[in-house]
Amino acid sequence: SYVFRNSQHAADRFGLADAGNIYGRLTNSTQDVFEKRIAALEGGVAALATASGAAAITYTIQALAQAGDHIVAQKTIYGGSYNLLAHTLTQFGVNTTFVDAHDLAQVEAAIQPNTKAVYLETLGNPNSDIPDIDAIAAIAHKHGLPLVIDNTFGTPYLIRPIEHGADIVVHSATKFIGGHGTTLGGIIVDSGNFDWKASGRYPNIAAPNPSYHGVSFADAAGPAAFVTYIRAILLRDTGATISPFNAFLLLQGTETLSLRIE
């Protein structure tokens, strides 16, 4: 926990009226610096660091899809992500259609009335195939859906998916961002560009949320609504929190990212 000046200060923090540390499971000062640096590198408005890349991906899908919902995903993705979508999340009522991301007609045809996101990787793992991000972003947005991209292999040094239409970018920071094999971590970057209210598909983010004092995250956090929702609800309840020391180690890796990618 953190020290508050008085009860009003605490109430403002918990009510999202005043930005800052609330509770150690949600954020810490070292984590905050790491989040801001990766958000800046990706061109996003905010970010949320997690204990692993798998946690970042899982939280992202859980924030978008609930029981009865559907995801469209590139079929050539990291095996852990494939298993999450193909097997684990189906136990919670979220189903995925895997598509050839190079066949734009197939991508669009896979979208259903209950689809909540399109999911890609900038460089597919392990094939290193590169989808047409701009074209798929246009398809997703045409249907009122956010485009989620795993940029672990691409890194923001080589490509910034938000500039090509991605709405949410995720990383396993364990890989190129960390770079030294010393620590685990993940991160979710919010572009701030997706209109959660206009879409009408995401009441957990856009409407008053009964799990958080009736706050609408779209109203309270504005462009950073997506990662704020995950921090306040999913991280609070399930706790895949990055430790301050792991955030420090990932900051050290970020310092040399460009040199190592070169």
Model regions and ranges:
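Short polar catalytic/cofactor-binding loops
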Residues: Y2-F4
